[in-house]
Regions:
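Long, contiguous N-terminal structural blocks used for assembly/anchoring
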Residues: 1-65
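Acidic, low-complexity, intrinsically disordered interaction modules
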Residues: 62, 77-95
Length: 121
């Protein structure tokens, strides 16, 4: 049996985790197909430049940017921001299982990406 001293956290470590373009596309697809619809007013592709992407949810992984409109304010979404949202999710939830994500998980990731925290829901 471990002593109280042995059970205490010694610190934390950051473990690099691969996030694929497919993961990012799926995250945004879930968000845009309803997961974040309760707080997002509308989404636009910056300069209407899809960069070869078939869907708006794929623009980020093709190097484009999105404008996300919320409560009359415009927020820019980029790939580095979305990756930061993924990182915050993994750190705060202590897991990264994109194959098991549902609309709630992806909504949280998008809010982390745009606001650094969960603001809605």
């Amino acid at each position: 049996m471990q002593t109280e001293h042995e059970r205490k956290d010694a610190g934390t470590i950051t473990v690099p985790t691969a996030v694929s373009n497919y993961n990012l596309d799926c995250i945004l697809s879930y968000c845009f197909d309803g997961g974040s619809g309760y707080w997002i007013d509308r989404i636009e592709v910056v300069d209407d430049d899809y960069r070869g992407a078939k869907y708006g949810s794929e623009v980020i992984t093709h190097g484009g940017k999105l404008k996300v409109f919320v409560d009359g304010e415009e927020h820019l979404l980029t790939k580095p921001m979305l990756l930061k949202g993924c990182e915050l999710y993994a750190i705060r939830r202590k897991e990264w299982r994109p194959d098991d994500f549902d609309a709630e998980d992806t909504d949280i990731i998008l809010q982390y990406a745009l606001f650094g925290d969960v603001v809605y829901g």
